[in-house]
From Swiss-Prot:
PANTHER family: 30S RIBOSOMAL PROTEIN S2 PROKARYOTIC AND ORGANELLAR, SMALL RIBOSOMAL SUBUNIT PROTEIN US2M. It comes from the Bacteria. Keywords: Ribonucleoprotein, Ribosomal protein. The gene is rpsB. This is Small ribosomal subunit protein uS2. Belongs to the universal ribosomal protein uS2 family. One of its GO terms (biological process) is translation. InterPro entries: Ribosomal_uS2, Ribosomal_uS2_bac/mit/plastid, Ribosomal_uS2_CS, Ribosomal_uS2_flav_dom_sf.
Length: 258
């Protein structure tokens, strides 16, 4: 059984790539055609590669791997936080701080500062301080929570990165590459696939597309952690006899652009 159906991908708009003039030629093998100046992603390949990504994440999670979900653009921010949390994993969904991986010891000191401020806010310490100082400390706490809240409980460097848009998250991907941390990524037609270990050709600019793929990655983590008998009931889809052929999808796309 496939993890995802062609119909699901189509309905979420996963097939829409970028304008042809913005493409990266290395993505050519994942492009089915071009319609009205827009590249159309080959969803048959996406179905297979989602399966590969799912299996990779599931197997890593079975071995206890920690997965860091990364997606800082507005289309990805909510889904990244919600799905990582659902899977009991970690996330960065606002801004990637340079050195998050390669300078982890420094990041750990900032995380400890965040935890100290959270404790001070909860144990009554703030009530004993001047109001002006409390205002400044709260601002510091809120800023640290925004950028580091999703990784404050991460025990160490992640074992795998799941990234939405490696072009946008270039620094995160470079750091992972330097440390030999595998990168699984949703990658659109404008990005270089060579920097990614496990590729999912997909529209990484549509909220529905991002949420669909990210939810499958979260399902993979959950299955890996809990065992196959406890896999999410909707993690797999039965073979759909009515699934459109790639030619029919092309026709649907063409009609939608008219």
């Amino acid at each position: 059984m496939a993890v995802i159906s062609m119909k699901e991908l189509l309905e979420a708009g996963v097939h829409f790539g970028h304008q042809t003039r913005r493409w990266d030629p290395k993505m050519d093998e994942y492009i089915f055609t071009e319609r009205n100046g827009i590249h159309i992603i080959d969803l048959q390949k996406t179905v297979k590669l989602v399966d590969e990504a799912y299996n990779f994440i599931r197997n890593a999670s079975t071995d206890g791997a920690n997965v860091l979900f990364v997606g800082t653009k507005k289309q990805a921010s909510d889904a990244i936080a919600e799905e990582a949390t659902r899977a009991g994993q970690y996330y960065i969904n606002h801004r990637w701080l340079g050195g998050t991986l390669t300078n982890w010891n420094t990041i750990k000191t900032r995380i400890q500062r965040l935890k100290d401020l959270q404790t001070m806010a909860e144990d009554g310490t703030f009530e004993q301080l001047p109001k002006k100082e409390v205002v400044l400390l709260n601002k510091q706490r809120e800023k640290l929570e925004k950028f580091l809240g999703g990784i404050q409980d991460m025990p160490g460097l992640p074992d795998v990165l799941f990234v939405v848009d490696p072009k946008k998250e270039e620094i995160a991907v470079k750091e992972a590459n330097m440390l030999n941390i595998p990168v699984v990524a949703m990658i659109d037609t404008n990005a270089n696939p060579d920097v990614v270990d496990v590729k999912i050709p997909a529209n990484d600019d549509a909220i529905r597309a991002v949420r669909l793929i990210t939810s499958k990655i979260a399902d993979a983590v959950i299955e890996g952690r809990q065992g196959q008998d406890s896999a999410p009931e909707d993690a797999f889809v039965e073979g759909d006899e009515n699934t459109e052929s790639i030619e029919e999808i092309a026709n649907i796309v063409e009609e939608g652009n008219n």
